[in-house]
Amino acid sequence: MSYPADDYESEAAYDPYAYPSDYDMHTGDPKQDLAYERQYEQQTYQVIPEVIKNFIQYFHKTVSDLIDQKVYELQASRVSSDVIDQKVYEIQDIYENSWTKLTERFFKNTPWPEAEAIAPQVGNDAVFLILYKELYYRHIYAKVSGGPSLEQRFESYYNYCNLFNYILNADGPAPLELPNQWLWDIIDEFIYQFQSFSQYRCKTAKKSEEEIDFLRSNPKIWNVHSVLNVLHSLVDKSNINRQLEVYTSGGDPESVAGEYGRHSLYKMLGYFSLVGLLRLHSLLGDYYQAIKVLENIELNKKSMYSRVPECQVTTYYYVGFAYLMMRRYQDAIRVFANILLYIQRTKSMFQRTTYKYEMINKQNEQMHALLAIALTMYPMRIDESIHLQLREKYGDKMLRMQKGDPQVYEELFSYSCPKFLSPVVPNYDNVHPNYHKEPFLQQLKVFSDEVQQQAQLSTIRSFLKLYTTMPVAKLAGFLDLTEQEFRIQLLVFKHKMKNLVWTSGISALDGEFQSASEVDFYIDKDMIHIADTKVARRYGDFFIRQIHKFEELNRTLKKMGQRP
């Protein structure tokens, strides 16, 4: 192996914020200390089943062979080859199938063997152990009862530092390739663990003084600046923004990729980091910046992220949510409807792997709830199949929202919004019991204020649909409002129904002001004139499209029948 193993012997070499090695997790409570020591002994001296040893050795050999081949390709000044692609495919099979099956069989609710225990099996291969630890800690976060300890949260952070330093600080491209799915999961899990730690450190009620002191003395562990720095470094190293810019203009992205961006490892990590930044800025409540990081990605065209369905779903979820909070309802509805239709048509392919299905199914349910909110606040036509699903899931709640029930809005928002976080380290000397909820409560207040401003609009819309002309005073009387109050509400209606809407261009922030409201009006002196702008359904277009699809299918079947 030709990677610089000596550089990866100590964690301190990776990160300037290494904690003292003699730190232990003793709490002062004899029962807790005894439980911890038993757990430590069990993990240290556990007997590793023979099948797991064989799997680890095979996994290591596959990764080592790929790295050796990659070194050869780099020395020959080649970017990739069929041999590399085949070995990446083997790793993908191990990662998505073998690892999952063995986890289910041997480690369903318990950790995999520690890296130190399997190190002799892999010749203390530093790079492989970093990759193994990434999977090891991810499994603890996801499946082990009680979740990760404080020490494990810190160790996982250091392991990510090791991994990203290996990729970013190498003299030339790192001799490593991984499946796109694994690369996406690395970025996704990195942000998830940061999010989890941000909430964990705010809940001090059940923490010992020793744990709080340790958190207080290590403010740079899982610091928001470190996380942002990693994501931006991966974006810059890959030159992905420039590649996307050239790609969308019809050019060859390879021409501007640079030394690192030509390699799949850097290109895909850079791309996934853009989506990671979208997610991170959304969690921090900066929706404009969240969408701005995707300014070179054309969401309405099939692109690189289509290769990983979870990345595609995550992208649309956070873009749609950001649009919703920016009061760009028409864009939010378009984004949610598009991705829900995609999930509806491809859902069967996700059931082969449970963890993918669970993640996509959860975001699918959340996006249905967000779409229900958006359509209540801004009624417009969507795909019939999605509309039918929505009525089945949230028909009653949409009726209650139309009547102005704030409790339903709050319930659906709480269920479907991201888990917001604060980037600021709390004051450990005086942490409010609900401090971890403050970011969510702040975003809920912003959303609820907007709902309150539109509370009367649904009722006004239903009245306007009944008439073509009506004295302002008379319609105000129907609503138990004074004429002045009613005129204010009509102005609110005009204002809220006019949205900034994306029409063309690459940046999702671009757009022009439009109104898709099914009813419009103007006031002439004391008389309100109303026009129904609802467009009649064009059934002919639908049937023509279906006929073309049927003819294409018929031609395909005939060709298949002609094959020898």
Curated annotation (Swiss-Prot):
Keywords: Acetylation, Cytoplasm, Initiation factor, Phosphoprotein, Protein biosynthesis
SUPFAM superfamilies: TPR-like (SSF48452)
GO biological process, alphabetically ordered: formation of cytoplasmic translation initiation complex; translational initiation; viral translational termination-reinitiation
The protein's name in its UniProt record: Eukaryotic translation initiation factor 3 subunit L
GO MF, one example: translation initiation factor activity
Main location per the UniProt record: cytoplasm
Assembly with partners or alone: Component of the eukaryotic translation initiation factor 3 (eIF-3) complex, which is composed of 13 subunits: EIF3A, EIF3B, EIF3C, EIF3D, EIF3E, EIF3F, EIF3G, EIF3H, EIF3I, EIF3J, EIF3K, EIF3L and EIF3M. The eIF-3 complex appears to include 3 stable modules: module A is composed of EIF3A, EIF3B, EIF3G and EIF3I; module B is composed of EIF3F, EIF3H, and EIF3M; and module C is composed of EIF3C, EIF3D, EIF3E, EIF3K and EIF3L. EIF3C of module C binds EIF3B of module A and EIF3H of module B, thereby linking the three modules. EIF3J is a labile subunit that binds to the eIF-3 complex via EIF3B.
Gene: EIF3L
Keyword Phosphoprotein: yes
Statement: the UniProt record of this protein carries the keyword S-adenosyl-L-methionine: no
Listed PROSITE patterns: PCI
Any one Gene Ontology cellular component term annotated for this protein: membrane
